Amino acid sequence: MATRGGYGWMVAWGCLAVDGQAAGPGLLPWLEEVLVASVIAFDVNETLLDLCALDEPFEVLLGSAALRPQWFTLMLQLAFTGGLTGQYVDFTTAQRAALAMVAERAGVPLTAAGIDGLVGRMSSLPPHPEVPDALAALARTRLRLVALTNSVQPVAEAQLASAGLRGYFEAVLSADGTGHLKPAPQPYRAVADRCGVPIGQVRLVAAHAWDIAGALAAGCQAAFVARPGMVLSPLGDPPGITGPDLAAVAEQIITLDG
């Protein structure tokens, strides 16, 4: 039996029961509130946008495209360390610091202008090929679409505008506005507050296990985009939806929530 909001529920043999009692008509509004999402919140970097576009500048500036995923992982470490130690670091600052560290580790001199140029490319990443059509399909449903990213607000807006995706979202929310980066609970709660819905009606879509874990811990529902190299953690509850790309995930969201 799964639990949500202190209640137990189960589906078996075509019947839904709550705390062992059959779900009658009076429970249907409550069940819709806790089981059906009305707001779909999308992570941006790697979930919607393809960071492989940075491989060429990494090759040019640092001599190896293989340093790009190392840089992104190190950037996350720096950002999360800041949050855990009470010394908040925004995503752009973490990106710049991680790039300097990767360059030093590789023994490659990198100027401030080089750092500016590469970090600036984060604002013009292309979407993964299936993303525009998947978002268009979701936009034709009753669902409300928002973006929730750790990127600072100006970068987030620039990213989605450059990728041609901004028009699909009623709001673009930066975790930076809460003073806490995902996977802390505050950014996920900010989505519910902004949209005026219970947090259980928010479904996060992300390609990162840590983002899925944060959303579920905050009380959201979740959908995992299992892009190449991305896997879920064996720890904690799994998300209700998993698919190899956003097209597959969107199809399941439309079936369950749309």
PLM region descriptions:
Residues 31-76:
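Active-site neighborhood of HAD-like aspartate-dependent phosphohydrolases
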